[in-house]
Amino acid sequence: MAVAGKRRYRSDARTEAAERTRSRVLEAGKFLFSRRGIDATTIAQIAERAGVSEPTVYAIVKSKAGLLHALMHDAIFGPRFKLAQQKLGGVEDAVRRIAMSAHVARAVYEGESAELSLLMKSSAFSPELRKIQQSFENLRREMQRERIDALFAAKRARKGLTKEAAATLLWMLTSRDVYHKLVHESGWKPERFQSWLEQTLIETLTETDWR
């Protein structure tokens, strides 16, 4: 028993050390990407700032694209998103699930803004960033499909709307561009964005005037 306990302790210690190293690499990448841009930053610079070797950086993230992907994943699918998904998972009504897409969208973009605002501004025209963003857009659309399927299965979709059109509208209305234009460019509070989006989704996609 004592031997097994020591092995578990060593395993836990190694896991914690690996997580700390990963965090240092990601923080170094975020700092340098934000100030120099993605394309101008090198793996050697990231390794130096993180206090690790270049092979260690490659072992953790494989490449700059892998590092960027990890940063965006952690920011977008962080605590805010997980809490929103938990709330969504507890709702069975198909129309209300559509409305709650506004809460999920706000959680995603608030998390992204808090963690990656400088990076997004400095690297807005990076081909690598555009490629990663597109992969997340595809994932976002795929994750929304279940809500659309449930809406049509419950026969509560807006009359004349096809399932594919509904999926496209949900994806478009909950996009980063809409959030950015309303919150960052027009000065809306995130609460106002969420309230507007809830009502817009209900009016656009369903036959129900749900409040």
Model-found features: residue ranges?
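Amphipathic alpha-helical packing segments from all-alpha helical-bundle domains
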Residues: 103, 107-120, 128-154, 164-168, ...
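Conserved catalytic core of Hanks-type protein kinase domains
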Residues: 60, 108, 172-173
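Short loop-to-helix capping motifs
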Residues: 63, 112, 125-126, 176
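Hydrophobic/aromatic-rich alpha-helical bundle segments in the mid-to-C-terminal region
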Residues: 152-200, 208-211
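Residues in the recognition helix of alpha-helical DNA-binding motifs
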Residues: 60-61, 70, 196
